[in-house]
């Protein structure tokens, strides 16, 4: 009988040990699942935070050029029709004729009343002032403008106070030294944005 009791006691101990091992294994599995879940949430939170920061930085980054008050988009019958003066030179908004200048490179100045309509129609104007001529500058500006198939003009603009002017609807940037990155950033920021009243 004592042997039976000992055998029963050993079986009971084995069962308890097996239960304890199973319980420990279940706890390890639960812990691993919890760690994986927490890890996945942490990775998702870091990714969401990074994406949110990137979007915020992109949205809050200052736009190129200087913002100017717009002067409306009234049409006038002809380029020589009287109208109030523009608030920028070259103009960035205001009175203009019904048609637009062809997109691309121009060898002669584009009348203000014509180029303003191009700006309203989603365009960007790149203009230069070189009283003594500047073929190298013009060639570099042409290369930039030709890289954009539509919505960009290049033309001389005699008499302005800087060598280079970039204009879009309600925006202007003027400077003397060629800066390809600055020009390209301005064009990419504003070309293709239509400004017609809806």
Predicted regions span which residues?
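Terminal, Lys/Arg-rich, intrinsically disordered segments and adjacent short helical elements
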Residues: 1-40
């Amino acid at each position: 009988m004592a042997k039976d009791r000992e055998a029963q006691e050993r079986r009971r101990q084995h069962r308890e040990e097996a239960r304890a091992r199973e319980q420990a294994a279940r706890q390890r599995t639960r812990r691993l699942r919890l760690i994986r879940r927490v890890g996945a949430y942490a990775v998702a939170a870091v990714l969401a935070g990074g994406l949110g920061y990137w979007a915020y930085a992109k949205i809050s980054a200052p736009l190129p050029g200087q913002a100017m008050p717009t002067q409306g988009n009234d049409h006038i019958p002809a380029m020589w029709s009287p109208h109030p003066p523009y608030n920028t030179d070259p103009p960035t908004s205001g009175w203009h004729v019904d048609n637009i200048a062809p997109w691309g490179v121009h060898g002669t100045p584009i009348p203000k009343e014509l180029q303003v309509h191009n700006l309203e129609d989603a365009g960007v104007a790149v203009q230069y002032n070189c009283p003594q001529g500047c073929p190298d500058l013009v060639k570099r500006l042409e290369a930039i403008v030709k890289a954009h198939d539509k919505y960009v003009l290049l033309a001389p603009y005699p008499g302005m106070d800087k060598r280079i002017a970039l204009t879009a609807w309600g925006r202007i940037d003027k400077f003397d030294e060629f800066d390809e990155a600055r020009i390209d950033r301005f064009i990419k920021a504003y070309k293709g944005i239509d400004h017609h009243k809806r």
